[in-house]
Design a protein with these regions (language model features):
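Intrinsically disordered, flexible peripheral segments
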Residues: 1-169, 174-180
Length: 180
């Protein structure tokens, strides 16, 4: 199963890393969840391997982590929508890939590394397809144009428990709003 949530708030995006990822698995005290970069876009920015907090936060702030340059024209401005102030720019999309509960139980309670490896392979296959259809919308002169980029900048974080501390194998993909 895949669920998705849009992250608009820069403050929430910044605190997400600090609260849930940098300090460890948000479900198990003392555990550290090391994220890993994914995507052609990440590679083109020189991002590979383990995610460093400074790089993640720079991207959330629309900055190239290597050079400090602004990545997109739109900044995190706000607009009025339905009487509420709303951010103009999406910081990232949070996709969560979860196998059925029975698969999590077999993988984690029986400590079956083959099932965890199968989950990881399935994620990689899904993400290759995900990236093949990656697109961005360009707005110019009051008209929208969708452009296929075939690249993403994303962080992958695999967890093995739910917030209730139940066995729950799942991988969070934070697809940042950057196309290069």
């Amino acid at each position: 199963m895949v669920t998705a949530k849009t992250q608009y708030s820069l403050n929430n995006a910044q605190s997400y890393f600090a609260e849930h990822l940098a300090v460890g698995d948000y479900y198990q005290e003392g555990q550290k969840v090391a994220g890993e970069w994914f995507g052609v876009g990440a590679q083109s920015l020189g991002l590979k391997g383990v995610i460093r907090e400074n790089d993640f936060l720079a991207l959330c702030e629309n900055q190239n982590p290597q050079s400090g340059e602004t990545l997109t024209q739109r900044t995190n401005t706000v607009r009025e929508e339905d009487g509420k102030t709303t951010a103009n720019r999406r910081i990232f999309y949070d996709f969560t890939f979860s196998p059925p509960k029975s698969v999590s139980a077999m993988a984690l309670l029986a400590d079956d590394k083959r099932i965890v490896a199968a989950h990881q392979r399935a994620i990689q296959i899904a993400l290759k397809e995900f990236e093949a259809f990656a697109a961005t919308r360009v707005r110019k002169d009051q008209a929208d144009d969708t452009r296929l980029t075939r690249n993403v900048v994303a962080g992958l974080f695999t967890h093995d428990t739910s917030r209730a501390l139940d066995p729950h194998l799942h991988t969070a993909l934070h697809r940042l709003q950057r196309h290069v």
